[in-house]
Amino acid sequence: MGDPRRLGKKYDTPNHPWIGERIQSEREISQKYGLVNKKELWKMETQLRNYRRQARKLISDTTTQGGKEAVQLFNVLKRYAILVEQEPTLDHVLSLNIESILERRLQTMVYKKGLAKTAKQARQFIVHGHIAVNGKRVTSPSYLVSVAENDAIEYVPNSPMASENHPERTAAVSEENQ
């Protein structure tokens, strides 16, 4: 009974809506990674901002609890290959950029693996349910792929895309061979 609680936004909008260079850089990033709207980009920027905020807080925290939290932050960022250094420091976390997170999206990974010809086609395959991760169908293009799941991205077995002679697959394979 009663109304469900109102969920908060998972992103922060820009402080000023009409800054030309920000709009231009957002447009370039959106085209490169096949994002449909700016909200997807703002969600990833907010996630990066939260990681950086946590790192800034941990730089000033010299207690043992601060050390444990730093190790946990490093483990999360390493799990998703956002942070690739062997001996990471909090300065490495502060130097991360938006591309390091966008590279780990399922949409980008499907495109980079050659399962789709373009980033937009990769998005379509994911939304239509043609892509599986670890044998499970994933329909969210913004799903962050962990390092353990890198090699487990494939077509869903009962999908028409799983057929080797599907027109879209043969076109993608012939383009790779040229």
Swiss-Prot record:
Record key words, sorted: Ribonucleoprotein, Ribosomal protein, RNA-binding, rRNA-binding
Matching Gene3D superfamilies: RNA-binding S4 domain (3.10.290.10)
Transmembrane segments: none
CC terms in the record's Gene Ontology section: small ribosomal subunit
GO biological process: ribosomal small subunit biogenesis; translation
CDD domains reported in the protein's UniProt record: S4 (cd00165)
Presence of the UniProt keyword Protease in the record: no
Residue numbers spanned by region Disordered: 157-178
SMART domains: Ribosomal_S4, S4
Domain S4 RNA-binding: 104-166
GO molecular function: rRNA binding; structural constituent of ribosome
Family, as annotated: Belongs to the universal ribosomal protein uS4 family.
Function: One of the primary rRNA binding proteins, it binds directly to 16S rRNA where it nucleates assembly of the body of the 30S subunit.
Subunit structure and binding partners: Part of the 30S ribosomal subunit. Contacts protein S5. The interaction surface between S4 and S5 is involved in control of translational fidelity.
NCBIfam families recorded: PRK04051.1, uS4_arch
This protein's name: Small ribosomal subunit protein uS4
Gene: rps4
